[in-house]
Amino acid sequence: MATGFVLDWSLHFHKRGKDGSGKCNIFPDGDGIHVAVYDISAADKLVLDKIEGLGSGYSETLLSVPDIGDCVSYIAEESYVEDSSITYDWYKELVLLGASAHGFPDDYLNRIRSLPQRQDPDTARRLKRWKTVELVRAGGY
């Protein structure tokens, strides 16, 4: 695993998710994004593709990460991008925990924190996802 910084991109929560909330997307319209880069097996990539929805909301793009090289990333398909999308608070918290665990700088974390969020209206899902957040926190992230 490695981390890097890619110029000219920005992080948004404007990919329409199946649950109606905004999910992460990178878009070539910003000052830059911090990235975590993993080397995974082909079998694990197939599993990740299914989880992330490759071909059903996300496609792939190559990001050129300085000192690392070209890396595959998911990017929202244009028909799934809705600038009015707002992410759920638990989802944004998971993104922040991951960004913090990877040592991304405070100004980047604050930029993520500044993005709008809303409470998940599905009580059962909300409680389940916040339990996930607490498990991640308990794991030291």
Regions found by a protein language model. Give the residues of each.
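Glycine-aromatic micro-motifs
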Residues: 1-141
